[in-house]
């Protein structure tokens, strides 16, 4: 579509169609924006041993692929946090089960007219 439109524009402007073909082919490839991560650099010398461990996307500061951040939480501290969090939710669930009034009264209490049939059931008039 873009190639046809640029071809029509080239004929209107009096061109020979070479520009239309080059514009059409570049618009079909990535809309003329280029590569998403910059130009590919062809290595001209041997790569370093740890080259695959660096993420180099063409910016000024390549970064390591493996984050080498010091351990901030040890395994036993993480286990304590996990146990505490799960214990909190278990306690909250048990509190909800113990405080559940609907499970203690599985049906709604009946309400009768005339003061809940107090006189009819043998109460004082």
Swiss-Prot record:
Transit sequence range: 1-29
Membrane topology: Single-pass membrane protein
Taxonomy, superkingdom: Eukaryota
Subcellular location: Mitochondrion inner membrane
InterPro entries tied to this protein: Put_Complex_I_su8 (IPR038863)
Keywords on record: Electron transport, Membrane, Mitochondrion, Mitochondrion inner membrane, Respiratory chain, Transit peptide, Transmembrane, Transmembrane helix, Transport
Keyword Transmembrane set for record: yes
Entry's transmembrane regions: 78-98
Position of the signal peptide: none
GO CC terms of this entry: mitochondrial inner membrane
UniProt function note: Accessory subunit of the mitochondrial membrane respiratory chain NADH dehydrogenase (Complex I), that is believed not to be involved in catalysis. Complex I functions in the transfer of electrons from NADH to the respiratory chain. The immediate electron acceptor for the enzyme is believed to be ubiquinone.
Record family assignment: Belongs to the complex I NDUFB8 subunit family.
PANTHER family per the UniProt record, alphabetical: NADH DEHYDROGENASE [UBIQUINONE] 1 BETA SUBCOMPLEX SUBUNIT 8, MITOCHONDRIAL
Subunit structure: Complex I is composed of at least 49 different subunits.
Identification of the protein by name: NADH dehydrogenase [ubiquinone] 1 beta subcomplex subunit 8, mitochondrial
Provenance organism: Arabidopsis thaliana (Mouse-ear cress)
